[in-house]
Amino acid sequence: ALIELIVSNNKLTSLDVSANTALTLLNVNNNKLTSLDVSKNTALKFFKCADNQLASLDVSKNTALETLNCYVNQLTILDVSANTALTNLDCNSNQLTSLDVSSNTKLTSLQCHYNQLTNLNMRNGITDELTTFNATKSGTALTCIEVLDPAWATANWTSANGNIDAGVTF
């Protein structure tokens, strides 16, 4: 069975991976995909679909997912509530207006900058576990990020550190 598939940088416009149910790594970065169905790939741990033209992405069946890199697409919605094993989420440079990572208690890296966020829910209790966090360049609509420990977040995540834009509170 195919376990890893790397087809990045190939100008692909479509790809059917539904028969590859044993995949644990799928890298389709830098293609021209407008859609991709990974609902049958329930063993996926590492999924990289950055630099495509994806308008939607359903990862609800990919509960083993640890890394999701879906940056530079056209995503308006990203539901990662079922992805409780997720440690690395990079969804920067999309069109997301809301992001809820409150179910993702194992996150150590969250890159959600260059979106149109008005709501960011990080009430997952892992505030100090994040070694990489960037929610900048979301315009002026994001004014408050939901966290469990606002005092810690205020002291450690600042605009000077490049974590948030000026004026954002917790």
Where are these regions (language model features)?
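Leucine-rich solenoid repeat scaffolds
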Residues: 118-170
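Consensus "Asn ladder" position of solenoid repeat domains
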Residues: 10, 31, 52, 73, ...
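Conserved hydrophobic beta-strand positions in leucine-rich repeat
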Residues: 5-7, 24-28, 45-49, 66-70, ...
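Short intrinsically disordered, low-complexity coil segments enriched in acidic
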Residues: 1-10, 147
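Canonical leucine-rich repeat
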Residues: 15, 36, 57, 78, ...
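Leucine-rich repeat
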Residues: 1-2, 19-23, 40-44, 61-65, ...
